[in-house]
Amino acid sequence: YDGEEGVCYHFTYGNALFIMLNSESMRSAEGLAAAQAWVRDVIKSNPAKYVVVMEHYQWFFGESGRTSQYGRWKDLFDECGVDLAIGANNHIYARTNAIYQGRETDGSKGTVYIQTPSSDNERGQGLKEWTDNKDLIKFRWTEGGSTVGAILLRADDSKLHLTLYDRNGNALDSVSVAAKR
């Protein structure tokens, strides 16, 4: 969208629409509104079996569970049927099951929110007391300051499958996101 060409973008890969957002341009209310209008239009104009939205900042703060970008995007994701939201930034893996209207669902509607862990062995951080969103966040993981983790995303006709691996290739968590279209 205007001023964000090459920074905010989208593409279709197989049967999934991927939307990438510029977190820095969304700090102001005007920037957030422009980004949300663009996301709404991209989803409407690019029908796909799965919709995945990615941005740099976390949906929840992994160390405590406190809400971060989730509060700014959840209503739009509910409205547009976003299947998977991937964020990062605080380098602690955190995952929800499908959430719709602020509550966990059976997966037939709602968005799964995931924060990716650190992958460079330098930017991890430790967990703190889990104070918020215990009903929404289903799994958290970090190795502390030297975290290395990776997420494998596979897709088939009925589900997206995500698996978290540690530095030694051990599977630590997995979630499947049901196709809703």
What are these regions (language model features)?
Residues 17, 159-162:
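Hydrophobic residues embedded in beta-strands of well-ordered beta-sheets
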Residues 1-47, 72, 76-78, 84, ...:
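Extended active-site neighborhood of metal-dependent phosphoesterases/phosphodiesterases
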Residues 46-63:
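Short acidic, glycine-rich surface-loop motifs adjacent to enzyme active sites
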Residues 169-171:
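Residue-level signal for glycine
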Residues 56, 88-89:
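Active-site glycine-centered loops adjacent to acidic/histidine catalytic or metal-binding residues
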Residues 178-180:
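Short beta-strand edge segments in extracellular beta-sheet folds
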Residues 30-31, 63-67:
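Short, solvent-exposed loop/turn segments at secondary-structure boundaries
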